[in-house]
C-alpha cells in the first residue's frame, strides 16, 4: 500500500511540470486556444489598445471611396489616382512593384520579387518579343 501511495505521489508531482511545459502544445494541437486568447486580450487591455474588427468582405467601402472621388480625367480603379490617361496610373505598391506599359494604353504592375531595378520590366519586354 505504501508503494502505491509513493507511485501516485510521484506521478502527481511530475504532472504539474509536464502540464506547464506541454500545456500550450496540447492546447494548440487539440483546439484549446483559450489560454492564448486570454493572453492576447490581457496584452491588448493592458496597453490601452482596442482590438478592431476585420474589414468587411464586401466591396462597399471601396465603392463608397470610388464614388466620392472627384476626377475630370481618368480615375484609376485600383489606386483612385486622377490621371490624364489609363497608362499613367501609378502602381498601388510602388516600392514593391514595377509598372510596365502595354499596347493600347494598358499598364500592369509586376512584383519586383527581389530582382535588381528594372529586371521585371526587362523580362516583360523579352516575353513581349517572344524571347522568354
From Swiss-Prot:
It comes from the Eukaryota. InterPro entries: LCL2. Residues 32-59 are annotated as: Disordered. Keywords: Signal. Residues 1-20 form the signal peptide. The keyword Signal applies. Residues 35-45 have a biased composition (Low complexity). Belongs to the LCL2 family. Probable component of the endoplasmic reticulum-associated degradation (ERAD) pathway. This is Long chronological lifespan protein 2. It comes from Neurospora crassa (strain ATCC 24698 / 74-OR23-1A / CBS 708.71 / DSM 1257 / FGSC 987).
Amino acid at each position: 500500500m505504501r508503494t502505491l501511495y509513493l507511485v501516485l505521489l510521484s506521478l502527481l508531482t511530475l504532472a504539474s511540470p509536464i502540464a506547464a511545459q506541454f500545456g500550450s502544445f496540447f492546447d494548440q494541437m487539440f483546439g484549446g486556444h483559450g489560454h492564448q486568447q486570454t493572453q492576447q486580450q490581457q496584452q491588448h487591455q493592458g496597453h490601452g489598445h482596442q482590438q478592431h474588427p476585420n474589414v468587411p468582405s464586401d466591396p462597399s467601402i471601396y465603392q463608397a471611396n470610388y464614388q466620392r472621388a472627384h476626377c475630370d480625367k481618368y480615375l484609376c480603379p485600383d489606386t483612385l489616382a486622377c490621371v490624364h490617361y489609363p497608362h499613367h496610373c501609378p502602381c498601388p505598391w510602388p516600392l514593391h512593384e514595377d509598372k510596365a506599359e502595354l499596347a493600347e494604353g494598358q499598364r500592369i504592375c509586376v512584383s519586383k520579387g527581389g530582382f535588381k531595378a528594372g529586371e521585371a520590366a526587362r523580362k516583360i519586354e523579352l516575353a513581349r518579343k517572344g524571347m522568354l
